[in-house]
A protein has these predicted regions:
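Flexible loop/turn segments at secondary-structure boundaries
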Residues: 28-31, 53, 231-234
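Rossmann-fold NAD(P)-binding glycine/threonine-rich loop
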Residues: 1-38
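A structural micro-motif
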Residues: 18, 41-42, 75
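Acidic, His- and aromatic-enriched active-site or binding-groove loops in soluble protein domains
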Residues: 39-57
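Long, compositionally biased stretches enriched for glycine and/or charged residues
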Residues: 65-328
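A structural signal for short, well-ordered beta-strand segments and their strand-loop junctions
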Residues: 20-24, 45-46, 79, 224
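A glycine- and small-aliphatic-rich helix-loop capping segment at beta-alpha/alpha-beta transitions
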Residues: 36-41, 64, 95
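Short acidic, glycine/serine/threonine-rich loops at helix termini
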Residues: 32-36, 56-58, 89-91
Length: 328
């Protein structure tokens, strides 16, 4: 967060009229600090988090109708929730309501899961069998927009009690070794490209190019973005970073009002909203005890107070070289 504050001051000084598109995580905390330091910043956040369910639904449409060529963008949605933990309460294709179709799939595959590539989740933390999505939908009546691992991380330990529990839901945790391998692979690819290898043609993992094109006057775009809540999600705290659709056009980003989350989904979300607020307050007041309280209040926290205190101290010790700001 101190780095975000530094970026914010530099943007205000060098290019105050620029549009800033944040892809950094944690999305909500980064955006909150950026706006706190430079309130007039033209800021929005975007990621590929919400692609997971739309891609699943596009596949379902093709399978159920016996057609091909339905893309993620062909699935129209109403999106609402906090950044990183958003939901769809409306999904359509060509004007047809797809919620009944989704319910049929959820009921049929709630136990076995619905897999594109059998057992891929065992080696790829970004793959899953959609069992968590189906379970949350059948219990809460609303579709998680994110992949199963991400959705599970925002819930109590229903799905994440241990690796055996996660495996039973057919998803895997994100491990340090996996992240290191991905980083190493990407670093090797970048070096090859810098040495003259031709860049491959590939589909971008976010809609950033389309967003930039729309902001520059290249046509209107509806895209999922993160923005401070100004009423677009009625029953989430004012100012918290929320994720909804937005109409993006020349020099303009206008959030689409998503409405209200069902109370059960809102209850899961509000806890995270206030925890994120506490983490930012810890930065502002340079008080790591405030962050500790947010750590204790995370839904996946199952440790007793003594064990949690020891774990927190161990975490701080491991990253102490990055915490000099809090010692000033």
């Amino acid at each position: 967060m101190p780095l975000c504050a530094e970026y914010s001051h530099m943007i205000e000084h060098l290019c105050p009229e620029a549009w800033v598109i944040n892809l950094c995580t944690p999305m909500a905390e980064c955006m909150t600090v950026l706006k706190r330091e430079f309130p007039e910043m033209k800021l929005l956040g975007t990621s590929s988090d919400t692609f997971a369910s739309r891609e699943l639904i596009a596949t379902m449409v093709c399978e159920s109708k016996g057609i091909s060529g339905v893309r993620r963008r062909d699935i129209k949605t109403n999106l609402l929730g906090i950044s990183g933990f958003s939901w769809y309460d409306e999904i359509t294709y060509g004007g047809e309501d797809l919620m009944p179709m989704f319910r049929e799939y959820a009921e049929k595959y709630s136990d076995s899961g619905y897999e594109f590539r059998i057992n891929e989740y065992k080696t790829n933390p970004d793959a899953d069998a959609h069992r968590v999505k189906f379970d949350l939908f059948l219990r809460l009546g609303i579709i998680p927009a994110v992949n199963d691992r991400s959705a599970a991380e925002f819930c109590p330990p229903w799905y994440t009690k241990d690796t055996k529990e996660m495996a039973s839901w057919k998803f895997s945790p994100m491990t340090v070794n996996y992240k290191k391998r991905i980083f190493s692979d990407k670093t090797a690819k970048v070096k090859k490209y810098m040495n003259g290898d031709i860049l491959p043609k590939s589909v971008d993992s976010t809609e950033v190019p389309e967003i930039i094109r729309a902001l520059c006057g290249g046509g209107n775009l509806i895209s999922a973005v993160s923005l401070p809540n100004r009423g677009q999600v009625e029953n989430l705290p004012e100012g918290t970073i929320v994720e909804t659709n937005a109409l993006i056009s020349r020099g303009s980003v206008r959030a689409v009002c998503g409405g209200r989350l069902p109370e059960s989904a809102a209850g899961l979300s509000v806890r995270h909203a206030y925890n994120r607020e506490a983490v930012v307050r810890a930065y502002v007041e340079k008080d790591l005890d405030i962050a500790f309280n947010a750590f204790l209040n995370d839904p996946v926290m199952t440790c007793g107070l003594t064990e949690a205190t020891e774990l927190y101290r161990e975490m701080l010790s491991a990253v102490r070289n990055h915490l000099l700001y809090y010692c000033e």
